[in-house]
Amino acid sequence: MYFLYVGIFGALGGMCRYAMNLWLGGGDFPSATLAVNLIGCFLLAFIMPFLAEKSRISLVLLNGIGTGFIGAFTTFSAFSVDTIELLQQGEVVLAISYILVSLIGGLVMVKFGRRFSNKLLRRGAHHVD
């Protein structure tokens, strides 16, 4: 059952990533890849703890969302290829900027996602009292 959910959600995540590429793609900077990776960092850090704590969603469905959808939506391989292509084009400053924004931005988005999730979880705990 895990494979089915991961596969279904993976297909949806891949389609969403493709749509983002159509929307933001083109140009000299890989903005679509950067966007999906930053959004994915936030979503994984926000949605997974929140759903695990506050919903009655099964572990199978949670794995489908996390591993399937978010895993297929984000892309480390495209990030790596984009970086190499920037370097091969002589865009060293742009490549280094892309690496730094991806890494630091991803960590910041995880921090924001966890904070937001924790804030909502605490707020929900106060309303139950």
From Swiss-Prot:
The chain crosses the membrane at residues 3-23, 32-52, 59-79, 90-110. InterPro entries: FluC. It catalyses: fluoride(in) = fluoride(out). Coiled coil: none annotated. The keyword Ribosomal protein does not apply. Its main location: membrane. It is found in: Cell membrane. It comes from the Bacteria. Pfam families: CRCB. It is a multi-pass membrane protein. Fluoride-specific ion channel. Important for reducing fluoride concentration in the cell, thus reducing its toxicity. Belongs to the fluoride channel Fluc/FEX (TC 1.A.43) family. This is Fluoride-specific ion channel FluC 2.
